[in-house]
From Swiss-Prot:
The keyword rRNA processing does not apply. It comes from Parasynechococcus marenigrum (strain WH8102). ATP binds at P96, I97, G98, A99, G100, L101, A102, G103, G104, S105, S106. It is an enzyme of class 2 (transferase). Catalyzes the phosphorylation of the position 2 hydroxy group of 4-diphosphocytidyl-2C-methyl-D-erythritol. This is 4-diphosphocytidyl-2-C-methyl-D-erythritol kinase.
Amino acid sequence: MGTITVTAPAKVNLHLEVLGIRSDGFHELAMVMQSIDLADRLSFQTTADAALTLSCDDPSLSLGEDNLVIRAAQLLRSRSGFNELGAAIHLEKRIPIGAGLAGGSSDGAAALVGLNALWGLGHSRSDLQRFAAELGSDMPFCVAGGSQLCFGRGELLEPLPAVQESLAVLLVKDPRVSVSTPWAYRRCRELQGDRYLSGEDAFEQRRQVLRDMAWTQPIRAAEPPPLQNDLQEVVEPETPAVQAALRLLSTLEGTLAVAMSGSGPSCFALFADPTSCAAAQATLEQQLAAEGLQSWCCNLRPDGVRIEA
């Protein structure tokens, strides 16, 4: 097979709850993650040697071994036992970097899916999700995509009903600002640690509460979901760009909910349909420009990384 192209969608967190600290030192999370159609695009081409090379149309992106695309390619090749395999990979970057939208994780997941097909390895999606969990907490979700309950570090997935309406999100981000995810979790522990749960039994009770909430039904405009993001409580007070984005989104009419995604600084408003979303974006055009904020109208997606036909 010569060349394969894969779409790598971003995600938003519709729910992010920090339950406590696990025995391995990671935070125990309870989340609802949703794929959106803001997406990167990766192409994979076979090479005559074992080299793994990555190029990108965004010169600010690191292309070395710290990039999840390269790390995913190396892991897949190692796990499959074919170290002679190589590939030339090109990344068209559309998801903003350091935005809380899992762009890097989605690109890494796309590398697993794309190279699995390019090299004819035959791994199942569950195999690829397991490999993804070794590389990043968001990566198994990015392989699966759609609407998912995510537990543990984020790697334990429970599918939710597919979205049955044409809901849309208006994303807003300051391109000059990024938020360190490790810092956000450290700050969360400092400020909210006294309310953390302790032990697997307590974690499971809280997971069950989330399972029993409205998330078990398809998201509908008539009954908007109860958004929650524990990290927003600690990031917003210390990040003026998040404050500005949430303030502007909260002024819009017709929003179903407004929240920060992940560790930020991207924020979003949920709308009943793409037309309402686009109208809201137009309404805010001058204010967004004055604040130096970028925006995207996005539809919800039912899947994760996908090989293009």
